[in-house]
UniProtKB/Swiss-Prot annotation:
Any one cellular-component term (Gene Ontology): cytosol
Gene: alaS
Binding site for Zn(2+): H554, H558, C656, H660
Function statement: Catalyzes the attachment of alanine to tRNA(Ala) in a two-step reaction: alanine is first activated by ATP to form Ala-AMP and then transferred to the acceptor end of tRNA(Ala). Also edits incorrectly charged Ser-tRNA(Ala) and Gly-tRNA(Ala) via its editing domain.
Name this polypeptide is given: Alanine--tRNA ligase
Domain of life of the native organism: Bacteria
Domain comment, as recorded: Consists of three domains; the N-terminal catalytic domain, the editing domain and the C-terminal C-Ala domain. The editing domain removes incorrectly charged amino acids, while the C-Ala domain, along with tRNA(Ala), serves as a bridge to cooperatively bring together the editing and aminoacylation centers thus stimulating deacylation of misacylated tRNAs.
Amino acid sequence: MITTKELRNKFINYFESKNHSHQPSSSLIPFGDDTLLFTNAGMVQFKDVFLGIEKKDFSRAVTVQKCLRAGGKHNDLDNVGYTARHHTFFEMLGNFSFGDYFKKEAISFAWEFLTKEIKLPVEKLWVTIYASDDEAFDVWHKHIGLAKERIIRIDSSDNFWSMGDTGPCGPCTEIFYDHGEDVAGGLPGTPEQDGDRYIEIWNIVFMQYNRHADGSTTDLPKPSVDTGMGLERISAVLQNVHSNYEIDLFQALIKKAQQVTHAKDINSPSLKVIADHIRACAFLIADGVLPANEGRGYVLRRIIRRAIRHGNKVGAKEIFFYKLVAELVSQMGEAYSQLIDKRELIEKTLIKEEELFLKTIENGIKIFDAEIENLKDNTISGEVAFKLYDTYGFPFDLTADMAREKGLKVDEQAFLAQMQIQKQRSKEAGKFNVDYNSLINSQVKSEFRGYSTLIEDAKVLEIYQDGQLVASTSEQVSAVVVLDKTPFYAESGGQVGDKGILEGVGFEFVVEDVQKSGEAILHIGKLVKGRLNLNDELTARVSDKPRLATAANHSATHLLYKALKLVLGGHAEQKGSLVDENRLRFDFTHDKAISRSEIEQIELLVNQQIRANYPVTTIETSQQKAKSLGAEALFGEKYGDIVRVISMGDFSIELCGGTHVAYTGDIGLFKVTSEGSIASGVRRIEAVTADKAIRHTFTNENKIIAIKDSLKANDTNLIDKIKSMLEQIKNQEKQIAKLKKELLSGSSNDIKETSIGDIKIVVANVDGVDVKTLRNKIDDYKSKNTKVIAVLTTTNADKVQFVIGVSNALTTLIKAGDIAKELSSHIDGKGGGRADMAQGGGNNSANIDQALSQVEKFILNNIKE
């Protein structure tokens, strides 16, 4: 039997023998593609190549791509564990041609691999083609020799693929495997096609057309090929099993899941869910995603919690999910070294998330069970689903999963409506960013010269106004200018774009920002003088002070990153950065606040490298060579085949396309200004360098001097004086609280008490006390009386604060919250609470006596009823 590991290697080796360049799997997080939540196909990393935006030094490629379908349009989560072939995470085998070979070669490669390399019986294979694709039919029939009756024409979208509403598209041919007559199902194109007998194993897409906005198509100048074959699916065929969960890789994970959950039935769908989900979770965490309440982090949290719930369902009594990581590393670590490198981070993240969820899951299940007991039909309300999500952390699909097991469904539309209301409440206005890649479709190439110079003579290639290509632009008009060469750095890798001017005979253009579109560098700004025309000669001049300050901050981020790893540990992975002339901001993975001692160690390490004045060296080399040198690849950056490696002595070595100082000493000084959390498991450090670091130090010193002057202290006794002052304040606060209590006790003689039978009613205003004192007095009344209703207020200027208490024995007659609403209506206020205790405040103290009189009447009326 061929193992999944062997099959993966065999596929790569075969296509390498056919002159395909083996490219590593890209991240599950698509770089620079906001249309996708996760990488869900092998072609995603080559999208810009197919579109002609990016060029590679190879025209044939082979990959084994990590894919995830668990959110957005492509979401298989609900079916995972209950069908033979649905997964959240899967591996896609693929070979690609970028204007090289086409239908004949692509079909021949696939057929040879299937029938010769892995020796599938020819009589077991069927193919489909797009109905009008006679060229593909001829290749299959005349070149391959496949019988006509085994070539099925499909006249539907199933056999025509497109990248989107516009862009590259074309027909495809699919290869199917026949599992035999004893399995239910019919041929593709028949009413019984959804059965399990005929299973699609390979899809070969021929991108030969370009679809336009009006729906018409034209031939692409260089047709390309994109293929995909699910590794798990073809493994099942070769291992002679009908379910992907029966292949060697999954069986190892399922057995481990049974062991750590103590499940009795190894065939339980829950174990399949756990085995599937550990792959998705581990690879997401390894690719930089951490559990959160939105975006990709929320999808990860959903998957983790679904796995935990299924573990509890089959018998897990303690945290278990992280225990599968070791087996996963054993099965897939050889192919994906990131699992080995990030194992500790993966395990820690899963432990923390499981501990967090277990605190709430029991209460959530009780709410769920109580709801279904009172159901009048078979639908759980969206409001209940939202409560489970909002209060107990139950993702919607987890609630839906539990409902399905009970033969119930959940009102998803009502749930989504509740989610929308919550989003509107918490929505914050975000900064508007122009997407220049979609606004401007430049086909020209700008040469960047800014590593070695800040001034460059250049020629105007393109001018854009409002996204439209124009021949010239006039004074005081905002525009985008593309040059043949430029010293201006375009925003990338967290570093902002340069500022400066473009000047020529009779004109001056102020550059406010610089971005990229394809290979064009866009100078964004305003013409402040004269007229600018296509083909004008000019001098491009970068403002040197902002550039140098930005370079110092960028170099400091490299030193900071290495210092974080040394002080906090290797798990500290970059999650994002921002570098401009004023500061640097660095986001990284870490699960707790950084202590003052750790910040001092980090600052000390960075400043030691600055004082060492190491040369900052740059080399350009292959990705493979850079990796062998130990270079760190930065988060969110896309690298070409030749990469730029920045080294700072022996301390730091990173791949980076940004601008840097010549020597670490040019950074001057490094000072952390803030540290905090921005998401679950993600911290942010902000820092300054050079003059701004010195000024930051001066500011802090001046504050300390001002404090010393105020306290008449010196360096020796400052801390002791502050401690002494705080102790005095604490003692005075205790004395004030005591006096307030005595004041309230003294006022008790003036507080009017009314009795209705055995019920005592207290309604009074007491000035000069705070809410805490009122609350203590209410508790005192309730402890001394089994039946009491007490309403106490205090005023300060026009403000009113109140506390209301109702004995538990009386809450069936009247509730504290209802009294709070009545009082609030008379004092322009608001308040609320439980049946036995409520509090609130208002902005109208002028008529407090009248308000209390109305409240007393309200209480008496309710008691009498």
